[in-house]
């Protein structure tokens, strides 16, 4: 009897082809975004340097954030590490949202959109891996 329940549960957790395609599209879009954003932080693009000056933690924080974003982007593209990458970037986006609201001002909408995208990927990939 427990074998039938296990089989039924694994069938429910198995993603449909359409869901898998949507998740991969979200992962690729997010990875491209974070490669660009993280790369610009690591390269020291002037607006990034200025933004991190305004944050006030020092430029080491720009390198850390850029490194986390590029690492997360890479992890999003490797099937066995997608969940880790998406979770890492979700936490990073929480920090970005709070920073925009408390320190930087301006619109946190891009960070919120990325948070929702990555939260969706994290949720479904976690459900699939159970």
Kindly give the residue locations of the regions a language model identified.
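Extended, low-polarity transmembrane helix blocks
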Residues: 1-36, 80-130
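Acidic/proline-rich low-complexity IDRs
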Residues: 8, 74-75
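N-terminal first-folded block
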Residues: 14-65
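Short, amphipathic, aromatic/basic-enriched membrane-interface segments that mark the entry/exit
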Residues: 53-61, 76-85, 103
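Hydrophobic, membrane-inserted alpha-helices
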Residues: 68-74, 92-97
